[in-house]
């Protein structure tokens, strides 16, 4: 089993004023909406900007410390991890991949350029949006092709986490790869270890029942297959791309309602 690695690094602008509240047990929860624009290279060598909005959750004493100090538009660095949660609602199982902040620091905004969305909310241009994961595939990769012939692969990654004083937890992350990277990933199999470097994106769609659904996933920019022991002495296989995805709307302007989010 691959060693678990689960780190998220974000630099963006606070799209709204942070929301502070407490659980019935008195635990402080600070929810932040961080917004930015990634600069990606397209197939023809040109550059394009892709907007993103990520909800970040900070708990406990740090939440209380920053709750009254942060405001809309402020630039913030977040180091944290992805946390997988499950719950049931009206007899249906739901899940969420949440960004849990471990550290947060406000940043000097001198020389930084912002953009505004249609609601006047700020986004940081040339932001930071990076994810580093290591885990094992939960299923064989699913490879398909778009009508334009672009390869896209979906992978399920199980990341084990053991924190001091806590039981081991497993976080399930959906990973998507494009083009040559997708075709390389299609050769992997369930149970294989995989190291992923990518960017965090959000999807939304309408279910067959008419409900709006959301999913947070990782768009892979680089994949490495770790090898352990003489059985895999052929060396690790790796693949890297300069950019991922196609021109789709990845900057979500809304999020799941609070009643959909467990804590």
From Swiss-Prot:
Residues 5-108, 128-227 form the SSB domain. Residues 224-263 are annotated as: Disordered. GO terms for cellular component: nucleoid. A motif (Important for interaction with partner proteins) lies at residues 258-263. GO terms for molecular function: single-stranded DNA binding. Homodimer. This is Single-stranded DNA-binding protein. It comes from Thermus thermophilus (strain ATCC 27634 / DSM 579 / HB8). The gene is ssb.
């Amino acid at each position: 089993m691959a060693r678990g690695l689960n780190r998220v690094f974000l630099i963006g602008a606070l799209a709204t004023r942070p929301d502070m509240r407490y659980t019935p047990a008195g635990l402080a929860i600070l929810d932040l909406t961080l917004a930015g624009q990634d600069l990606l290279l397209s197939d023809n060598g040109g550059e394009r900007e892709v907007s993103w909005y990520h909800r970040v959750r900070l708990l406990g004493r740090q939440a209380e410390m920053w709750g009254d100090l942060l405001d809309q538009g402020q630039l913030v660095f977040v180091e944290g991890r992805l946390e997988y949660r499950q719950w049931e609602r009206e007899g249906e199982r739901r899940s969420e991949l949440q960004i849990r902040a471990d550290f947060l620091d406000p940043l000097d905004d001198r020389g930084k350029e912002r953009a505004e969305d249609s609601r006047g909310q700020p986004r940081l241009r040339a932001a930071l949006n990076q994810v580093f994961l290591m885990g094992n595939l939960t299923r064989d990769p699913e490879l398909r092709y778009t009508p334009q012939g672009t390869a896209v692969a979906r992978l399920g990654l199980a990341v084990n986490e053991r924190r001091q004083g806590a039981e081991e937890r497993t976080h399930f992350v959906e990973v998507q790869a494009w083009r040559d990277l997708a075709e390389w990933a299609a050769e992997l199999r369930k149970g294989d270890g995989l190291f992923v470097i990518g960017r965090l994106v959000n999807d939304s769609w309408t279910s067959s029942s008419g409900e709006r659904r959301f999913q947070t996933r990782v768009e892979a920019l680089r994949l490495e297959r770790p090898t352990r022991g003489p059985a895999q002495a052929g060396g690790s296989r790796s693949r890297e791309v300069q950019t991922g995805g196609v021109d789709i709307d990845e900057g979500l302007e809304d999020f799941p309602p609070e009643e959909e989010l467990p804590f």
